[in-house]
Swiss-Prot record:
Protein name, as recorded: Transaldolase
Oligomeric and partner information: Homodimer.
Species of origin: Vibrio campbellii (strain ATCC BAA-1116)
Task of the protein: Transaldolase is important for the balance of metabolites in the pentose-phosphate pathway.
Enzyme class, first EC level, given as a word: transferase
Gene: tal
NCBIfam families per UniProt: PRK12346.1, talAB
Annotated pathway: Carbohydrate degradation; pentose phosphate pathway; D-glyceraldehyde 3-phosphate and beta-D-fructose 6-phosphate from D-ribose 5-phosphate and D-xylulose 5-phosphate (non-oxidative stage): step 2/3
Entries under CDD domains matching the protein: Transaldolase_TalAB
Reaction equation(s) it catalyzes: D-sedoheptulose 7-phosphate + D-glyceraldehyde 3-phosphate = D-erythrose 4-phosphate + beta-D-fructose 6-phosphate
Family annotation (Pfam families): TAL_FSA (PF00923)
EC number: 2.2.1.2
Keyword terms, alphabetized: Cytoplasm, Pentose shunt, Schiff base, Transferase
Claim: Cytoplasm is one of the keywords in the record: yes
Cited PROSITE patterns: TRANSALDOLASE_1, TRANSALDOLASE_2
């Protein structure tokens, strides 16, 4: 019998949640996802130094203003890392919009267009890019605009059913519901561990997946933010799963049968009317975990973006 990673690949598209080229080469995922924290981590790897230098050179050619140079360097660095990753995968790279734009639809759209233009100028076509946006109301509206322009989006920091429903209704390409961070919240609140089958994060993604399939939404469900391989295996059959290198290694080393847990119902139920802004805010607000985790996630990504900018500013 093949290892659990090989078996999982037969049921689910496996994506690598990393900006590290060596890990991507090793595990040969279909796609890869990055975020500000992963870009910061990658930027500290010695082999990426030439990418930072090239990004600084680009930024200096665009503007004489130091603050603008820092912004342009960070954007180009994310794109340069994405370009390197694309050399090693057949599918798509997810590159994230600055988390500080999470409540700014126009700002998010402008930043997304800028990132896509940088990729396009380097010969990378839109069908190899996903733009990551936070699943705030403003982020979802930005994605709705971008999707109509042929820019596919990956809606991240998704913790509530309201967020998932609003994303489907906006016609976004893909969502990344977080599993481990949901479990973290309940573990801290209830002071106990959860079996994978009763893990609140696993249950959340399962409910979203089943809802999408029952109502015939085309939005791809990509489970994210895993704490252990038990969570991953409980979601075998999900459209995609984005997995950190350490957990890919664990799956590769694990023997035993992988059972398909999520099955596409291929339903065609009559869809409800799209949520209004007020309905979205109310439904999302009823989920205390989601409210806390979205805010925390945005803050943490913004902190890491700031650290990256400080690192770049010191090199300019």
């Amino acid at each position: 019998m093949s290892n659990k990673l090989e078996q999982l690949r037969k049921l689910t598209t496996v994506v690598a949640d990393t900006g590290e080229i060596d890990a991507i080469k090793k595990y040969q995922p279909e796609d890869a996802t990055t975020n500000p924290s992963l870009i910061l981590k990658a930027a500290q790897i010695e082999e990426y130094a030439p990418l930072i230098d090239a990004s600084i050179e680009y930024a200096k050619a665009q503007s004489n203003d130091k603050a603008q140079q820092v912004q342009d360097t960070c954007d180009m660095l994310a794109v340069n890392i994405g370009k390197e990753i694309l050399k090693t995968i057949p599918g798509r790279i997810s590159t994230e919009v600055d988390a500080r734009l999470s409540y700014d639809t126009e700002g998010s759209v402008a930043k997304a267009r800028q990132l896509v233009k940088m990729y396009n100028d380097a010969g990378i076509t839109n069908d190899r890019i996903l733009i990551k946006l936070a699943s705030t109301w403003e982020g979802i509206r930005a994605a709705e605009i971008l999707e109509k322009e042929g820019i596919n989006c990956n809606l991240t920091l998704l913790f509530s059913f309201a967020q998932a429903r609003a994303c489907a209704e906006a016609g976004v390409f893909l969502i990344s519901p977080f599993v481990g961070r949901i479990m973290d919240w309940y573990k801290a609140k209830e002071g106990r561990d959860f079996e994978a089958s009763e893990d609140p994060g696993v249950i959340s993604v399962t409910d979203i997946y089943n809802y999408y399939k029952d109502y015939g939404y085309n939005t791809v469900v990509m489970g994210a933010s895993f704490r252990n391989i038990g969570e991953i295996l409980e979601l075998a059959g999900c459209d995609r799963l984005t997995i950190a290198p350490a957990l890919l290694a664990e799956l590769e080393a694990a023997e035993g049968e992988v059972v398909e847990k999520l099955v596409d119902s291929k339903g065609s139920k009559e869809r409800p009317a799209p949520m209004s802004h007020a309905e979205f805010l109310w439904e999302h607000n009823l989920d205390a975990m989601a409210v806390e985790k979205v805010a925390e996630g945005i803050r943490n990504f913004a902190v890491d973006q700031g650290k990256l900018e400080d690192m770049i500013a010191a090199k300019l």
